[in-house]
């Protein structure tokens, strides 16, 4: 009997990288593998994508794990470095780093490095989280251009705040600021992440940075799924039935008795709960697949178990397979039902969920 297991489909991952090349044919791709590759496993994901032009991570520790795992492709520190003492390691490991504030710039100017570092100056075009403000950007850029520890030319990166809202006008404004600053500068440019790749072809530039869409999940919250863009789900969260029970009409189920059956039926108990990372907020009616057919969750999600209404004539039995999301049941549907973003669902599975890679 299978306990909670997440299946990672390597073939789908490779397919998605190729599909993104088709969507952004003039761009090189930074495969974003931060946060344990969005819950898919950092090292195995990178090893599955040897043709990625580079990898993007949030922390130096992630980059060093990739290097220790044999990954030799360029690795970009999307948040830059946190301490000046990190710079010798960044140089020695040939990492690329974002630079987005005065403290980082001063650290670069003062460092004693054996080799210069490839730098991506982060321009704040409207996200207002990290980055150099446009009115300060030219002077910042000139200092980077004159810094002995920076491999020239300086590259320029930014990030969209509302790429998933094509009617907002915010993305066009960010693009205008980005294009104005980059004009005449020789470095590489990058602003498009998943939403930019899908909706804003004019933003693809030299490098694009696919994140969640690389894993077959739509970054948009408009009812679309990764399949709508030609991508395949890489992660399937699976488990099995551990019991099947007869249940009488009028009887409640689970903590608080929040669901009461209107008919005699058969209930299945699934070895999955919020202790595995499944959302406790999932309401009755949230779908799962049992033996390939859709059935609803009933009652509250518990730490270790959920109950599903199999139907009065169901022939399912203990040990039968269950898919909570993934192949045949897009995680975007679960996100819509639970009001928990797909980003959070796929990255928050706990350590007791086994991970298995399949082709």
From Swiss-Prot:
Gene3D superfamilies per the UniProt record, alphabetical: Alanine racemase, Lyase, Ornithine Decarboxylase, Chain A, domain 1
Enzyme Commission number: 5.1.1.1
A Gene Ontology molecular function term of the record: alanine racemase activity
GO CC annotation, single: cytosol
A GO BP annotation: cell wall organization
Residues carrying N6-(pyridoxal phosphate)lysine: 34
Active site residues per record: 34 (proton acceptor), 255 (proton acceptor)
Residues that bind substrate: 129, 303
Pfam family of the protein (one): Ala_racemase_C
Family: Belongs to the alanine racemase family.
Function: Catalyzes the interconversion of L-alanine and D-alanine. Provides the D-alanine required for cell wall biosynthesis.
Protein name as catalogued: Alanine racemase, biosynthetic
Organism the protein comes from: Escherichia coli O6:H1 (strain CFT073 / ATCC 700928 / UPEC)
Gene this protein is translated from: alr
